[in-house]
């Protein structure tokens, strides 16, 4: 084996980025290596290999990367805090709205959840009386209110005073309707005497008017003591209130002193011979026979809207 000369010797130095020392120390080392190689006269070829990424970064680059990462982390933290703050605010707003609603309900300004009207203060369901009762809730507000409006109270105050005239008028009306059915025997006899005298062409018999009629129309001095009047009696059919049977009666209307007197004459049965004659003796049917010296006359009819009556004892007549 021959000797190897120094010119054939190659020294392989590691690449620059494989140096663990600082930049200054690495450059000094390369300078020393180059100087040694030049002194030896041997070429130095650096070893170029595919190594790991650069690890030795300057301080400014490291600081920049660190600040960038820190800024990104801070942004993420800010976003997280913002989302948390937003959700917290929503929760707080909802809680405050619920509190305000409960406060408004407690203060008496709450509205019904169903119809929107004002809710009752005592209602725990926050509803008006109608909705609360219709839904079947157990609430103390279901008791019916005893409040009465002012208009209704005025009506109640006026009704007792106004009820008396109404009651009086109803009583008078009812009594007026019952009077034709309840006629005293004395008045019937007087009316029968008037009918007998007026229809038999005989001098009319005088009779004294009832005191109740005189007192009802005014003082006794204003009414004549005796009245002679010709009257026409109209035959009508009436129905009894007790048994509902139909019977015939005569209706008379007399005007005395500006007042109208009317009444019914009911059948009282057969009278004795010395009493008043029967209806057949009055010849209302228009027969041509004479009876007891009384000539027959035409049927007497009651013209419509004609009131019969007489003056104050000076004769008889009729008024339309």
From Swiss-Prot:
Compositional bias segments (type: Polar residues): 193-214
List keywords of the entry alphabetically.
Activator, Auxin biosynthesis, Auxin signaling pathway, Developmental protein, DNA-binding, Metal-binding, Nucleus, Zinc
Extract one GO cellular component term from the record.
Answer: nucleus
Among InterPro entries, the record links this protein to: SHI, SHI_C, Znf_LRP1
Q: Where is this region: Disordered?
A: 90-110, 150-223
Q: Where is this motif: Required for homo- and heterodimerization?
A: 256-259
Q: What happens when the gene is disrupted?
A: No visible phenotype.
Single GO MF descriptor? metal ion binding
Chain residues that bind Zn(2+) 2: 112, 128, 132, 139
Q: Domain of life of the organism in this record?
A: Eukaryota
Q: In which tissues is it expressed?
A: Restricted to lateral root primordia.
What is the similarity comment for this entry? Belongs to the SHI protein family.
The protein here is known as: Protein LATERAL ROOT PRIMORDIUM 1
């Amino acid at each position: 084996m021959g000797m190897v000369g120094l010119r054939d010797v190659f020294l392989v130095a590691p690449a620059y980025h494989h140096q663990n020392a600082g930049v200054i120390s690495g450059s000094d080392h390369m300078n020393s290596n180059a100087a040694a190689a030049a002194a030896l006269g041997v070429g130095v070829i650096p070893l170029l290999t595919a190594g790991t990424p650069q690890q030795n970064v300057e301080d400014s680059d490291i600081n920049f990367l660190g600040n960038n990462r820190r800024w990104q982390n801070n942004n993420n933290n800010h976003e997280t805090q913002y989302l948390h703050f937003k959700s917290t605010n929503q929760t707080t707003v909802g809680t405050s709205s619920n509190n305000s609603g409960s406060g408004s309900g407690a203060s008496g300004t709450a509205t019904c959840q169903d119809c929107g009207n004002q809710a009752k203060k005592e209602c725990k369901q926050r509803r008006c009386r109608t909705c609360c009762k219709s839904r079947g809730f157990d609430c103390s507000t279901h008791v019916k209110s005893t409040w009465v409006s002012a208009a209704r109270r005025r009506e109640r105050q006026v009704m007792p005073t106004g009820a008396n005239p109404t009651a009086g008028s109803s009583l008078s009306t009812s009594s007026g309707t019952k009077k034709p059915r309840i006629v005293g025997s004395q008045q019937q006899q007087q009316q029968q005497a008037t009918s007998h005298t007026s229809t038999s062409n005989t001098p009319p018999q005088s009779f004294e008017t009832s005191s109740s009629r005189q007192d009802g129309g005014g003082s006794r001095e204003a009414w004549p003591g005796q009245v002679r009047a010709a009257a026409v009696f109209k035959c009508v059919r009436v129905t009894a209130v007790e048994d509902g049977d139909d019977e015939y009666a005569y209706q008379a209307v007399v005007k005395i002193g500006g007042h109208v007197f009317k009444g019914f004459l009911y059948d009282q049965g057969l009278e004795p011979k010395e009493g008043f004659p029967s209806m057949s003796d009055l010849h209302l049917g228009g027969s041509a026979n004479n009876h007891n010296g009384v000539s027959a006359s035409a049927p007497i009819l009651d013209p419509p809207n004609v009131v019969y009556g007489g003056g104050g004892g000076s004769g008889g007549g009729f008024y339309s």
